[in-house]
Amino acid sequence: MALTPGWGSSAGPVRPELWLLLWAAAWRLGASACPALCTCTGTTVDCHGTGLQAIPKNIPRNTERLELNGNNITRIHKNDFAGLKQLRVLQLMENQIGAVERGAFDDMKELERLRLNRNQLHMLPELLFQNNQALSRLDLSENAIQAIPRKAFRGATDLKNLQLDKNQISCIEEGAFRALRGLEVLTLNNNNITTIPVSSFNHMPKLRTFRLHSNHLFCDCHLAWLSQWLRQRPTIGLFTQCSGPASLRGLNVAEVQKSEFSCSGQGEAGRVPTCTLSSGSCPAMCTCSNGIVDCRGKGLTAIPANLPETMTEIRLELNGIKSIPPGAFSPYRKLRRIDLSNNQIAEIAPDAFQGLRSLNSLVLYGNKITDLPRGVFGGLYTLQLLLLNANKINCIRPDAFQDLQNLSLLSLYDNKIQSLAKGTFTSLRAIQTLHLAQNPFICDCNLKWLADFLRTNPIETSGARCASPRRLANKRIGQIKSKKFRCSAKEQYFIPGTEDYQLNSECNSDVVCPHKCRCEANVVECSSLKLTKIPERIPQSTAELRLNNNEISILEATGMFKKLTHLKKINLSNNKVSEIEDGAFEGAASVSELHLTANQLESIRSGMFRGLDGLRTLMLRNNRISCIHNDSFTGLRNVRLLSLYDNQITTVSPGAFDTLQSLSTLNLLANPFNCNCQLAWLGGWLRKRKIVTGNPRCQNPDFLRQIPLQDVAFPDFRCEEGQEEGGCLPRPQCPQECACLDTVVRCSNKHLRALPKGIPKNVTELYLDGNQFTLVPGQLSTFKYLQLVDLSNNKISSLSNSSFTNMSQLTTLILSYNALQCIPPLAFQGLRSLRLLSLHGNDISTLQEGIFADVTSLSHLAIGANPLYCDCHLRWLSSWVKTGYKEPGIARCAGPQDMEGKLLLTTPAKKFECQGPPTLAVQAKCDLCLSSPCQNQGTCHNDPLEVYRCACPSGYKGRDCEVSLDSCSSGPCENGGTCHAQEGEDAPFTCSCPTGFEGPTCGVNTDDCVDHACANGGVCVDGVGNYTCQCPLQYEGKACEQLVDLCSPDLNPCQHEAQCVGTPDGPRCECMPGYAGDNCSENQDDCRDHRCQNGAQCMDEVNSYSCLCAEGYSGQLCEIPPHLPAPKSPCEGTECQNGANCVDQGNRPVCQCLPGFGGPECEKLLSVNFVDRDTYLQFTDLQNWPRANITLQVSTAEDNGILLYNGDNDHIAVELYQGHVRVSYDPGSYPSSAIYSAETINDGQFHTVELVAFDQMVNLSIDGGSPMTMDNFGKHYTLNSEAPLYVGGMPVDVNSAAFRLWQILNGTGFHGCIRNLYINNELQDFTKTQMKPGVVPGCEPCRKLYCLHGICQPNATPGPMCHCEAGWVGLHCDQPADGPCHGHKCVHGQCVPLDALSYSCQCQDGYSGALCNQAGALAEPCRGLQCLHGHCQASGTKGAHCVCDPGFSGELCEQESECRGDPVRDFHQVQRGYAICQTTRPLSWVECRGSCPGQGCCQGLRLKRRKFTFECSDGTSFAEEVEKPTKCGCALCA
């Protein structure tokens, strides 16, 4: 209610003081009770259609139903619904909601229904419904959702109805519906779906409604599973059709054969299509703020899907990402910076960055990129920074940078580029800095242009140098004269180790042959060359690769075999292979032979051989394998020969060879098998399998030595006590605290204080950042293959000279954000491969000269955010970073005062001067003894490991001598005890305890209750030096020795003259009538079950009540109503036709039509039931025929029957043939044509048949599905418009002629129901037809018959009947086939089950008796019995008797029961025009029946009003409130 100052109702102005009172009251009520513009009724808050632009505030916490539909809300924030823990129904449809923040629904744990349809949602955040376990119905239809992420519905485990139709979904991530096991309804129709992950719907056993039609399904080999899934469920997923390829377009998916789902090419068949989610929210493993998505160091192996569309920067560095897929970043058009540095990226799709018009920084350094695809940087017009350094790029196309006109810094530093084509940098008009150093440039005539370019544009700042020819080696390119760049046959223009491929400016070079190897006839011979790793570049045509007799120790997972599609044999025998990385053979599906004989393998696991799908021969002879577990050979299903000869195998786990399905030869000889109980299974397995084994023999125990395994009896395989639990388990490849990917181990942010056990020995990257390390773990030196160590964000305060020993392969060391103050001079000794060192964010002030003497490869030093003291002692560092720009210009000086804030990189070295000794704080960082850390006069000594060490005087200890040895100094005695120090004794001190305490430190309270004197059940409570007694209710005194009389006048608790009775448990009050409670203080409410009627008010009295009647009523219970004249009925003057009754509905006359009739006065017959087979309807006066649009609804359970027929020679016929609709049409052409519906309609349900005839074309559609079309291209004739239109059949002579001319295939008349026949959009009235006998009005019988396990047929001879499913019988298909009627003995009658075990016989006319076996019974035993309110029923036991209607009793059903409410649950129906409309779901109410005393009527006393959706027979729908009674009683007749 809105109030305006000074104005009230229409009666006139309100006084100011009265307005203030009203305003204050309205403010108090509105602020706490209901949001503005909303209506609150009970627990329902209705805010629909009020123009809201945001969720209103102050929604009551107890709200159960909230209606916000029909507003202008644009966004749902996280806290909009906070605190609404009781909400069950939330209506948000028909708004403009574009985004819902994650967590918005977290508080609504009771939410059951949520409608978000008809909004503008583009994305669905993951985990949005994670706390809505009670959610059963979710409507997201008619939005713009583009993708369904994997965790979209995680948490909504009780979801039964999910509607996603009419969106723009093009991507469904695998597992998106996995949690929805109870789903019954799923709609995905009218989207842009092209493919669906395999088995997406297999876990939905209750699914009964499923829609997938109107999508863009591409029916290739990846969608073959869907066809089989739909065929197994023929009643759901109807009209799901293929949109491609062209040969399958328009076909139903379920009808396409498996062989027709094909993929072109082997690569496509193996590649399961994936989709990049076009919009999303912050990934769970990342952090997002201010448009920046930070996923650094999260162990990612792929770019996350479903990222925020609005992000401007994404940080993905320090992960394990191996490739950038097509369009990976294209959806994120606002991106300005992408950082993918320090990953494992080897492949980039050409369109990975397509469309990023705002991108200005792209960081890709520290990866494994070898090639830049054509056009990969196309369209990046605003790019200013491009870092490609520290990769393996060997070739740059001339047009690689043609769109980068605004690029200012390009780094190609540290790659494998040997030459650059002229014009590569021509388009870089804004370039200011170019890094080309650390590349093996061949300075021949092809590179002359680069020298000229660099002299003209001195922008190359990293010092790029020549590597070849020898005369120009190590000279800076920009300083060499042009004439020196020449091509000569006398010079060698290659770099040793790189001449295995040909140079080509287009980067399409094919490998010639690996260095030092021989290549002949597709055989690459690289044996006996002392190789330590497999050559990187091998010709793609290679069929056999010989690498035997080398020194290879580790087989790395480089993906090199993906390009060798012709490779058949790999020989790695006689090497030093001790480790094979998981996935090392990925892509080697064509390899059939792998030889690993004579190596150093100690264990094997299935991941080592992943990718060898076609392997047939695996040779593992002469290794060090000790056991075989059941994961050793998983996936090698094609292996026929497996040799494990001459290893150290002692045991084999059960099932170890079960996955080798093709195994025919297994060599286990020369192994020391221990034939104990763990190997008992193998003897039996070898005997049963028909494979060649060579009879392996036992080595242990002694009594079985040299006995073949197959010959050992099962009882002889026995174990000593305690050995049963042994066995062979796979070696753990990753610590429990860490995550491992290939050779990358991530143990970040795990609160570690020590290095976890189980780190693989071949680890190359180890991430220990974000932990609690105080020192560098000493075990790091045992991992000799380490290339990267990240120890940032720990608490490391010092390094030693041995912290990084034995790490010769280390290239990246990150020590940033620790507490380092001083670096020892030999801390980095031996790190000759180190390229990147980060000391950023520590407390370092100085570094000793020569500290980087061994790190000759160092190119990046991060030392910023340190308080550098830039005096003469740091001058060397300034000069060192300037050579090669090793420091990026971040580090600044913190002292002396005149150097404060100056950059280490740009400040001239001469400025670094010593004007006196550094401050004591600076000196103490590398000489902590200067800060006097030792306390209590301890002596400080420098220590190379612990930085310093204190020598403590007598009486003190600790690192800083801070701990006193005086045992009483810490006050060990508690509770006021006195400490006495002891010298030379076992105990360093003793305590003198006060009274009430004891123990070594006086910490124990003495138990004074040991000898207590509490009597009569009193409880002793210990105190300090004493105790007290807690007495029962009826005792008192210090020891509970005195009995208390609780019923004495002073203590009597009973009120209102109640009698007090003493009991052992205390006093008990016996109350007077009318009172209750423990002390009889409560006056009983006698009005609780009062019988006052007609709105009378009950007045409570002592032990009684009285009724205060409303005006005009009288009687003790106000049951006598006033005398009023009977009102005039609205039905007077209303004429209802065809036997309809007029009823009063809200003072409005309404005709209640009989079944089959419709119209305001029931004047039209709209539905008919064909009960005889030889009958029909005949229309003779039709307009605009034969150009007609015919629609009708049909229900039948028959296979054949005529629906429509018109014409003679030139005809149109519609018939039911074998359950399908068949249309035959002949407008004058010959021969006539016919089409059939794909659907069957003989299931007893109503189906809509739509037929459009226009000249020579006919369209047929069933239930609004895709139409079937037929064209006749003969000479056009007009059909005979004078011939009648027959419905449901036709005369015998017409039938015979049509059958003879093949116009119909089955002449059977229609048997079933037809309703709502429209011809040219005009609803037909069957009363205006020639109706033959056998056609009856109405199709309602099946609404009265419920079939539990079957389908209702409305037109059976005895009336509606159920066609039961297999295994069910009975009138309602509710009895099992093997129920009590199975094998019944009814002779002349029908068996009727009474319960699960017994039955009775319902006799035919003329028979009686319990088994209907007595002839001569009266044909009509009920003839003389007149039941007033019921019907007569005869049985063999009771004879003829009355069965009364509900509400009546008596022998003749003559007695009406008292007013009562009979519960009803059914659909509610109304009539609108000619259409019959009913609610979409049943509702519950009570029917008031019975009699009332006097002149009262039995009617509803309590009514419930709710809004329901109605669906009408003409296809329309609407919503309307329905009012139904929920409680009945006697009241004044209305």
UniProtKB/Swiss-Prot annotation:
GO terms for biological process: axon extension involved in axon guidance; axon guidance; dorsal/ventral axon guidance; forebrain morphogenesis; motor neuron axon guidance; negative chemotaxis; negative regulation of axon extension involved in axon guidance; negative regulation of synapse assembly. LRR repeats lie at residues 62-83, 86-107, 110-131, 134-155, 158-179, 182-203, 310-331, 334-355, 358-379, 382-403, 406-427, 541-562, 566-587, 590-611, 614-635, 638-659, 762-783, 785-806, 809-830, 833-854. Residues 927-962, 964-1003, 1005-1041, 1043-1081, 1083-1119, 1127-1163, 1340-1374, 1377-1413, 1418-1454 form the EGF-like domain. Residues 34-61, 273-309, 504-540, 725-761 form the LRRNT domain. Disulfide bonds join C286-C295, C443-C466, C445-C487, C513-C519, C517-C526, C675-C698, C677-C719, C929-C940, C934-C950, C952-C961, C968-C979, C973-C991, C993-C1002, C1009-C1020, C1014-C1029, C1031-C1040, C1047-C1060, C1054-C1069, C1071-C1080, C1087-C1098, C1092-C1107, C1109-C1118, C1131-C1142, C1136-C1151, C1153-C1162, C1313-C1339, C1342-C1352, C1347-C1362, C1364-C1373, C1381-C1391, C1386-C1401, C1403-C1412, C1422-C1432, C1427-C1442, C1444-C1453, C1459-C1498, C1477-C1512, C1488-C1528, C1492-C1530. Predominantly expressed in adult forebrain. Expressed in fetal brain, lung and kidney. This is Slit homolog 1 protein. It comes from Homo sapiens (Human).
